[in-house]
Amino acid sequence: MLQSCIIQNSKQENCEQIEIIIREINEGGIKDIVFSNADGGVFYINRGLERGLTLQGMKNKVLNKKVTLHLAKIITGTSSNHIAQISLGEEVIYTEFN
């Protein structure tokens, strides 16, 4: 059962792409950066604070703006809330893609 929650592959073709307006940014989990939208959706960059990102930097960049998220899929093919890439227009803010 636990294996079905594992993110298998953070490649662009294995992600769901959505657009949201970021309404809130906080720290959660273990150094995760957590983004919320107006509809109650919650998405996160796993250990984002260990990857050179800061809460204030993300707030300055994307708070109250429309961004594109690439959400990694778990082994079953269902989309997770794990952000594999976040973009603002043409600018990639963070990516796990090579």
Which residues make up each language-model segment?
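OB-fold and OB-like beta-barrel modules that bind single-stranded nucleic acids
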Residues: 16-22, 64-67, 71
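OB-fold (S1/OB) nucleic-acid-binding surfaces
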Residues: 29-49
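A short, sequence-level motif marking secondary-structure junctions
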Residues: 46-52, 97-98
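OB-fold/S1-family single-stranded nucleic acid-binding modules
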Residues: 74-98
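Structural detector for short beta-strands of small beta-barrel domains
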Residues: 8-31
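Sec-dependent bacterial lipoprotein signal peptides
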Residues: 1-2
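Short nucleic-acid-contacting surface segments enriched for D/E, G, S/T with interspersed K/R
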Residues: 52-69
